[in-house]
Regions:
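Structural motif
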Residues: 48, 55-57, 64, 80, ...
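Anionic, Ser/Thr-rich low-complexity intrinsically disordered regions
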Residues: 30, 58-60, 92, 100-108, ...
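Short acidic-glycine-tyrosine-enriched beta hairpin
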Residues: 62-78
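Conserved short histidine dyad/triad with adjacent acidic residue
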Residues: 11, 28-42
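Ligand-binding loop in jelly-roll beta-barrel domains
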Residues: 77-101
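A short, N-terminal "cap"/entry segment at the start of jelly-roll beta-barrel domains
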Residues: 1-24, 104-113
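A cytosolic small-molecule/anion-sensing beta-strand core signal
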Residues: 52-53, 68-69, 87
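Short, conserved beta-strand element in jelly-roll/cupin
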Residues: 31-33, 43-58
Length: 113
């Protein structure tokens, strides 16, 4: 099945594409260019970060965790976290509950095309 969801830039050098979602879960693919950074942020959803390829630093509540291909990390809701990308990286992120704001952005972008 072809994914019709658009690629959306989250911040410079970091894009995401919704892969699937349900009543209690949401999953997206993210591509991160080498040297890109996502500032510290937090959200109420739990998150599992899984590195498909590449290397990055996941900074959780001020502590850096270097992650490489095959690594996963669980983030509780409302925990401050950010990213510093060491090399081009692909990440599969899973959230619970869904990221409704991302789904709304996807829907708005599909209507424009």
């Amino acid at each position: 099945m072809q994914n019709e969801n658009p690629w959306i830039e989250i911040c410079p050098g970091i894009k995401r594409q919704t892969k699937t979602s349900g009543k209690t879960m949401y999953q997206m693919l993210a591509t991160l260019e080498a040297g890109s950074k996502m500032p510290a942020h937090q959200h109420p959803q739990e998150q599992i970060v899984h590195i498909l390829s590449g290397r990055m630093k996941l900074i959780v509540d001020g502590t850096a965790h270097e992650m490489k291909t095959g690594d996963s990390y669980y983030l509780a809701g409302n925990v401050p976290h950010g990213v510093e990308t060491i090399e081009e990286t692909r990440v599969l992120d899973t959230f619970s509950p869904p990221r409704d704001e991302y789904l709304a952005i996807d829907a708005a972008n599909r209507q424009r095309t």
